[in-house]
């Protein structure tokens, strides 16, 4: 990707690295900014604490990149949302400065649960699924004759007691 982007100087890269710490055992995260230093002036990295530290809903994140763009983004953000509450800021600070043992433990647990889910979905003849990596959710492909995803989720809940969220929510 970096080789192609070098030929297109008008293109910027926005690298969403929210799943940086939720890796399979033995895998290593590679930040786009680190592997493509020639594109550093056109690369912006978005990250946060929602996934890696289970702080979903606390709305603590960060953006790194070229100073002028970051300043403009900060000005825009400051006029469109309120500040992050103090307990979430303290939680984020503790996450940055503390041990990552809990993150490793959570990643193992998420991966285990995802594997159970994937195995169960693979056992349903009508569904096809690509085994997900780097995340804790799955997106099975429904047959063409199936109802749309939202209706499918309603049927799953009503008929078999399975609560699932349709992919369109994401």
Task: Give the ranges of each region predicted by the language model.
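PLP-dependent class I/II
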Residues: 1-170
């Amino acid at each position: 990707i970096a080789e192609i982007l070098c030929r297109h100087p008008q293109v910027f890269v926005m690298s969403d690295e929210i799943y940086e710490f939720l890796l399979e055992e033995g895998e290593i995260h590679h930040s786009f900014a680190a592997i493509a230093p020639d594109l550093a002036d056109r690369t912006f990295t978005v990250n946060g604490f929602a996934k890696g530290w289970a702080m979903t809903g606390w709305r603590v994140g960060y953006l790194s990149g070229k100073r002028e763009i970051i300043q403009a983004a900060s000005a825009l953000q400051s006029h469109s949302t309120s500040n992050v509450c103090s307990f979430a800021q303290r939680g984020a600070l503790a996450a940055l400065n503390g041990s990552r043992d809990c993150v490793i433990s959570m990643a193992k647990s998420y991966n285990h649960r995802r594997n159970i889910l994937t195995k169960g979905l693979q056992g349903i003849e009508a569904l096809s699924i690509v085994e997900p990596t780097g995340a804790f959710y799955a997106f099975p492909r429904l047959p063409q004759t199936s109802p749309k995803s939202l209706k499918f989720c309603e049927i799953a809940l009503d008929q078999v007691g399975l609560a699932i969220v349709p992919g369109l929510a994401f």
